């Protein structure tokens, strides 16, 4: 699978703690190896959220492409998604 990231995700990822980075990397490796991880988001097709501490890691799967969308606080994610 190919992995892409948004500018927003890159910015959020740079601000993440070492532990958060380890967990995100583990999730991404799991996505490459198998199937979906996390909770599907209702109003966004093929988009999933994984809780990491008090933040949410949001990604989209489209065929063989994984798009890392963002890693924000719960409020920030759901405000953004509407």
Could you tell me what each predicted segment is?
Residues 1-27:
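Arg/Lys-rich, positively charged N-terminal/basic patches that mediate binding to nucleic acids
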Residues 2-4, 15, 52-56, 60-82:
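Enriched for short, Lys/Arg-rich terminal
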Residues 8, 46, 73:
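Residues that form or immediately flank small-molecule/cofactor binding pockets and catalytic motifs
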Residues 23, 42-43, 65:
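Hydrophobic alpha-helical segments and their boundary regions
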Residues 28-51, 78:
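A short, surface-exposed loop/turn module that caps and links secondary-structure elements
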